[in-house]
Amino acid sequence: MSFSILIAIAIFVGIISYYLWIWSFWIRKGVKGPRGLPFLGVIHKFTNYENPGALKFSEWTKKYGPVYGITEGVEKTLVISDPEFVHEVFVKQFDNFYGRKLTAIQGDPNKNKRVPLVAAQGHRWKRLRTLASPTFSNKSLRKIMGTVEESVTELVRSLEKASAEGKTLDMLEYYQEFTMDIIGKMAMGQEKSLMFRNPMLDKVKTIFKEGRNNVFMISGIFPFVGIALRNIFAKFPSLQMATDIQSILEKALNKRLEQREADEKAGIEPSGEPQDFIDLFLDARSTVDFFEGEAEQDFAKSEVLKVDKHLTFDEIIGQLFVFLLAGYDTTALSLSYSSYLLATHPEIQKKLQEEVDRECPDPEVTFDQLSKLKYLECVVKEALRLYPLASLVHNRKCLKTTNVLGMEIEAGTNINVDTWSLHHDPKVWGDDVNEFKPERWESGDELFFAKGGYLPFGMGPRICIGMRLAMMEMKMLLTNILKNYTFETTPETVIPLKLVGTATIAPSSVLLKLKSRF
């Protein structure tokens, strides 16, 4: 037998041994959980759009308990739904769990010039978070409220026309048009409403329907060839659409920069408040000195390499792209679930309409009036408890071996929260856990956050930076609809909802009627 054949056999045996070693990781640790298949683990369970992977977590939690282990290709993941464990990882030991679970397709967050805030880690994450946070402050939201109002008016006009014809409406489709319209104007330089004629909507839908498909499964199994995989799979529909969208964002940002430069040369002062996130990100500055270059295990410390106090061109593109994806999907889904629950609970809808009539008597709803709609906020929070959207993205990566509640977690281990089970845990929420009960929030949400039992937008320092914007959009639209209409079910309404999805859990449709109140 030739030496080259022996080398080939040795390499083959080494590869097989490595994958079997990873696959048996939790067995050797004595941690129970679904084993799946060698090489794959259970990664193939998360690629079926008709059977959401996040709901697989819930099935396994019922079988294995609130803490169990899985492998996803070469990734080792601990799935948790114990609220104390969640709080420990996301809040108390944040310095040990400040990274996120990433795939080879996403690239190295420390080298990617367009790394979004959601994927960044360490001091780069701190810098991006500090620079981006003012963009989502109440002060900034006031500045862009006019943009949201325009889309609200356009959607209500469309709903008025459709409801007058007695149609059963798929509210999910209407809400997707609404959120895409806002994002187009805020992030893509869109100058007017393109609702129901937006060419970008199908591109974004493709990303969400195919975004966690076999491309991500293969990259999870063979991460060592990540760069090659990114080049090979760039032609797949979901990744090609992502590239197309980033090109559009580049054009919009370049156009804005050219306009600013021309105005400056002509001595023209900026007029009015920023109307979109392109302006807000371009204006982002910080008086804080940032540092980079620290070793991962010394995240809490700083070294002396100073970096920019403003966002670069590529960083703005990265933030706009993720804002587009996250803002489109999660807000549309939250609105859909809220509308469905109101339609199936008319007594709660009536109570909410009474609050809307009392606090917003005038045709125009103001920013300050939104903050007075306490029961509406309870309704949305309860909808997000019953239908948490993004279990698969509620994850962290352990970057320093540590001990959590008596369990050793090795560096490199992923932590994924089974949010669905957590939000439906009777030990946290009581025996009425499966009931739609907005009143449970009337005393505030601090108790549930402190328990680690509620994370619709994540938890801890990495909590979703855009949650205020999402709440503003939802409250503004629902208020304007409920001032004039009542959601009603029809014989076509699917009860209970059929749930689908990959990265998020979505209803296949939300078929309702709108009945005029006047």
Swiss-Prot record:
Broadest EC class assigned to this enzyme: oxidoreductase
Keyword Repressor included in the entry's annotation: no
Domain of life the protein comes from: Eukaryota
EC code: 1.14.-.-
Binding site residues for heme: 464
InterPro entries in UniProt: Cyt_P450, Cyt_P450_CS, Cyt_P450_E_grp-I, Cyt_P450_sf, Cytochrome_P450_3A
Reported cofactor(s): heme
Keyword Hydrolase listed: no
SUPFAM superfamilies given in the database record: Cytochrome P450
Keywords: Heme, Iron, Metal-binding, Monooxygenase, Oxidoreductase
A GO molecular function held by the record: heme binding
Cross-referenced Pfam families: p450
Recorded family membership: Belongs to the cytochrome P450 family.
Function field: Cytochromes P450 are a group of heme-thiolate monooxygenases. They oxidize a variety of structurally unrelated compounds, including steroids, fatty acids, and xenobiotics.
Protein name stated in the entry: Putative cytochrome P450 CYP13A7
Species this protein is from: Caenorhabditis elegans
